[in-house]
Design a protein with these regions (language model features):
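Intrinsically disordered, low-complexity regulatory segments
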Residues: 1-158, 167, 172, 241, ...
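Basic, low-complexity terminal or inter-domain segments flanking catalytic cores
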Residues: 2-11, 21-22, 29, 146, ...
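Conserved nucleotide-binding/hydrolysis micro-motifs of P-loop NTPases
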Residues: 17-20, 37-43, 102-106, 129-134, ...
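C-terminal or mid-to-C-terminal helical accessory/interaction module adjacent to the motor/catalytic core
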Residues: 84, 91, 131-215, 279-283
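A conserved hydrophobic secondary-structure block that centers on an alpha-helix together
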Residues: 101, 296-298, 302-306
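C-terminal helical "lid" subdomain and adjoining coupling/linker elements of P-loop NTPases
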Residues: 175-179, 194-255, 302, 326
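Pre-Walker A segment
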Residues: 263, 267-288, 293, 299, ...
């Protein structure tokens, strides 16, 4: 521990409030421990700048692009109270310890704290790889100064992302749609997903056939084998076909269904024999300990966690002292961790399960940063999952168990055994030679598999690689006779490339060296929130809007969605972090162009974009004469008008909405024609409403099938008669006011029930649907009770009090008495008996009120009783932490009242204006982005 300060007190600042209690317990009364709650300063929105700066070189980005990209900082509105509190505490201590995280973001937070607090006492920088007593004690022995190179790298990244987004996003708004955004990593991630969907759209399936057989030995043991060759030529499998359905090799036999069935029949009575037996030793090594990237991948495979949930749960485990720091590219373990893992493996599984020498691993990541250890259980002796089960939530326990197993297994012995490969064959009655193959692996020593086995991603091949699967074959020798008990011809179809899952997208981004694994969760959440991607059955499906965005970026901003270029930017940021590259020169090359490589800068590209044909950008050819267009209200199909051969007149184009649940690769030429045919129709006429005389039709719309009434438009004569009947009103000057035309009547519309079908729905069904809401009657106080169908299903309504009912069919059968019985039960909603909160997350440091998650009309939302914010679609209630809730509420406050404050008030925490020099000084202006989750 450090030497005591003069008055026995020192202030230690961490990032997260959840660390405070744990660290305070280790340090005792000599220290005041507090948190900054993430970043305290950031670049403001340009609209929030003081008036005198809005029109200058700072006005566009809140960065002075003419003065070495000097950033203009303000203290975040929701952090002013926290900064004031830290300043008060700093007056009562004799030393300041900045213990924010040890990555770029954490280093920047420490720098900003020092700049804003302006301490007059000694300042020490320290980091904790884990929140344990031992780690904290070691950290006090490794105190250092703030690493200004790391701060430079973070500042460069923040300015880079600001410039990238602010220059390119407005182009998307003008040419594709409002509310869209471009980002250095998010745009590349979106391109990956779109490119995979393009591959699926262009894919042509190929059919191929083979034979499978069940064979019996003379000792009556059975095993399965598969046809691999006919007349000495290998039989084609899925890997032999290109994505256009053609064979990639002429040296294979492509069996048709007829050939396969004929061969199976001809082999029915043929005598089979073993032609060769080959046995090889089998060895499998354990996987390396977790990095940030591999943890997200494996948690997605094994636990079905999204990347964001994984990082949130890992953050809680780290801050509570259960695991080491969770943002790392390193696969290395410290000496004490290796000893702990080997010792525990030996105790749990036996000494034979631990190799004689410790295992070491090398990173495979393209841009790995080895500053931290791999993710592992905290401490010099690991707690088993059973030992911590009672103190962790279910998600925390499952992730801890995964990390513990992976860490232990990484220091265990190889799994060993043997793999046997057998070839057997026969001559068919039609003279053709058929050869079958079978293989089996027998694991004689499980080694690390006793603790853990790594998951795998889905592949596109039907014949998935099963080399690690354990399967035993009977004892066989060359020449042994076999009987074919069962032979079957089997048809197969090649599969398109699988869509990305969160796990495989994270893996690809990591392998390409794009972005940092610690930001992948936020990147994936962003592309979901922007509507570029949605999750369907675990796969990432791009929207048609994403197609338009990617096409625009590829054609007008090609380098900025290029994988190699984006990866190189990440390498350059690493060089800046190591002090090998100047941030000012690098940003100048990026924005203005030039440099050693004569790069074309972003500014000249934007300044010389020329005319971008928005219609062309938002058009995707589906088939000859059929185009999908991304419109203001969603995607739709358009077919070219046809020419009347007799008159030469061209008909208007035919249009049809595209269902929201139809994936891009499912919109084939045939499907497009089907939708257009439906679009030509005004709907299926069901009959006439006897009450109104209006025609009732059933249609298929973008959001599913529905029924509606056709209300004839008023004729010019009717409109004029209406206007003539209206009294004339006059302006004050005596001139008559123009009369307003009547508003068109709005037709009644109702979605079909889930149990109904567009082709069979009747007029009676339609009239019932259009009659909703149905009035059941009134209660004893005279309040009307109705029943209707809504977004979340059928429900009763009495004033503001709504109650769900069982099924859609009950809408037409439920009685007033049954409704009154439901209302007589304890209320689950409404003011009189509010539903308990879905979650309680602690006290908000800004409002000092309890934060809860409630169920609202439009879904769950977070509130402290003053500020409300909807739970983001990319997050779950279970994954929300106190820190995340505080962050979301702070963001909402910043977007609301904070913007209405006079701009001058936001300049109080402006960064120091000292210009950067070659030799870094503590007064050098720097910035900070929102801390990554």
């Amino acid at each position: 521990m450090p030497t005591k300060a003069k008055n026995g007190k020192a202030l230690l600042i961490v990032e997260s409030p959840s660390k405070v209690k744990t660290i305070s317990g280790y340090l005792g009364n000599e220290f005041l421990v507090d948190s900054s709650m993430g970043h305290i300063r950031d670049l403001p929105q340009p609209s929030e700048l003081p008036e005198n700066l809005k029109k200058g070189p700072v006005g566009k980005f809140a960065v002075n692009i003419d003065d070495d990209f000097d950033p203009y900082y303000v203290v975040n509105p929701d952090k002013k109270k926290k900064v004031a509190e830290l300043k008060r505490k700093l007056k009562d201590v004799d030393a300041l310890y900045l213990a924010t995280d040890g990555d770029r973001e954490g280093e920047a937070i420490a720098w900003h704290l020092k700049e804003v607090l302006k301490p007059k006492v000694p300042v020490y920088r320290m980091t904790f790889p884990e929140i344990t007593r031992e780690a904290i004690e070691r950290a006090f022995g490794e105190l250092r100064d703030i690493d200004l190179h790391l701060v430079d790298a973070q500042e460069t990244r923040r300015i880079l992302d600001r410039i990238y987004g602010y220059e390119i996003s407005p182009v998307l708004w003008r040419k594709v749609g409002r509310g869209l955004s471009a980002g250095r990593v998010q745009s590349v991630a979106t391109r990956l997903v779109v490119e995979r969907e393009r591959e699926r759209m262009a894919f042509v399936a190929a059919n191929y056939w083979d034979l499978t057989g069940h064979f019996i030995t003379t000792s009556n043991e059975g095993f399965d084998a598969k046809l691999v060759a006919v007349d000495g030529t290998r039989v084609a499998t899925g890997k032999d076909f290109a994505d256009d359905g053609t064979l990639t090799s002429t040296k294979v036999t492509h069996l048709s269904e007829a050939e396969a069935r004929t061969l199976a029949e001809a082999l029915t009575a043929a005598p089979f024999s073993v032609r060769s037996v080959e046995t090889k030793p089998y060895k499998r090594r354990p996987a390396a300990p977790f990095t940030t990237s591999t943890l997200q991948q494996e948690a997605a495979r094994k636990l079905r966690f999204s990347s964001r949930v994984t990082m949130q749960v890992a953050q809680r485990l780290y801050e509570s002292g259960y695991i080491t720091y969770m943002r790392t590219d390193s696969v290395a373990l410290s000496d004490q961790a290796v000893k702990a893992a080997r010792r525990q493996a030996s105790e749990l599984y036996g000494t034979e399960y631990v190799p004689s020498a410790p295992r070491t691993y090398a990173s495979k990541s393209k841009n790995a940063q080895e500053a931290h250890e791999a993710i592992r259980p905290a401490g010099d002796a690991f707690r088993t999952p059973d030992a911590v089960r009672g103190t962790l939530s279910n998600d925390e326990y499952r992730l801890y168990e995964l990390i513990w197993k992976r860490t232990i297994a990484s220091q265990m012995a190889d799994a060993t055994g043997s793999t046997a490969s057998v070839r057997l064959g026969a001559t068919a009655s039609n003279g053709r030679d058929a050869e079958f193959a079978a293989s089996g692996t027998v694991i004689t020593f499980r080694g690390f598999l006793a603790a853990y086995e790594e998951g795998v991603d889905a592949t596109r091949l039907a014949e998935r690689d099963a080399k690690n699967a354990e399967k035993r074959l009977p004892a066989l020798a060359q020449g042994d006779s076999l009987t074919a008990e069962k032979l079957e011809a089997a048809g197969h179809e090649t599969l398109p490339p699988p869509r990305y899952t969160e796990a495989s997208l994270v893996k690809t981004l990591d392998e390409l060296g794009i972005g940092r694994p610690s930001t992948y969760a936020a990147v994936i959440s962003t592309i979901m929130d922007r509507g570029y991607v949605q999750v369907r059955s675990g796969s990432l499906v791009p929207s048609w809007t994403a197609f338009s965005v990617v096409r625009l970026l590829e054609t007008s901003f090609g380098p900025y969605v290029n994988y190699e270029f984006t990866a190189q930017m990440e390498e350059d940021l690493d060089r800046i972090a190591r002090g090998e590259e100047s941030r000012v020169e690098w940003l100048g090359d990026f924005y203005f162009g030039g440099g050693v490589q004569k790069k074309r800068g972003l500014k000249p590209i934007v300044d010389n974009l020329g005319d971008i044909d928005a219609r062309d950008i938002n058009s995707i050819r589906i088939a000859d004469g059929i185009v999908l267009r991304v419109g203001k209200f969603g995607p739709y199909l358009e077919a070219e008008g046809t020419v009347n051969t007799e008159t030469g007149e061209v008909s208007d184009p035919v249009r049809a909405n595209v269902p929201t649940d139809l994936a891009p690769d499912e919109l084939t030429a045939e499907k497009a024609k089907e939708l257009l045919e439906q679009g030509k129709s005004d709907g299926r006429v069901l009959g006439t409403d006897p009450t109104t005389g209006n025609q009732i039709i059933a249609r298929d719309g973008r959001y599913g099938p529905y029924v509606t009434e056709v209300i004839e438009e008023m004729t010019e004569e009717q409109i004029q008669a209406y206007l003539d009947a209206q009294p004339t009103e006059y302006y004050k000057n005596g001139k008559p006011k123009p009369k307003k035309k009547p508003k068109p009547a709005k037709p009644r519309t109702a979605s079909l029930f889930k149990s109904m079908d567009l082709a069979t729905v009747t007029l009676e069904d339609a009239l019932k649907l259009l009659s909703l809401p149905r009035v059941l009657g009134t209660d004893a106080e005279g309040n009307e009770i109705t029943v209707q169908n809504g977004r979340f299903g059928p429900y009763l309504k009495k004033g503001t009090d709504s109650r769900s009912i069982g099924s859609e069919e009950e809408i037409f059968t439920i009685t007033l008495e049954q409704a009154l019985d439901i209302y007589a039960q304890p209320k689950q909603r409404g003011r009189a008996a509010a539903k308990p909160p879905l979650a309680e997350l602690g006290v908000d440091p800004n409002s000092e009120k309890n934060i809860v998650v409630k169920d609202g009309r439009f879904g769950p939302y977070i509130t402290d009783g003053v500020t409300n914010i909807t739970v983001p679609r990319s997050e779950t209630i279970e994954s929300l932490t106190h820190e995340r809730a505080v962050e979301l509420l702070a963001e909402k406050r910043a977007k609301g009242p904070a913007k209405r404050k006079p701009a001058a008030k936001k300049t109080t925490a402006k960064k120091s204006t000292a210009k950067k020099t070659t030799a870094k000084k503590s007064t050098t202006a720097k910035k900070t982005a929102a801390k990554k989750d």
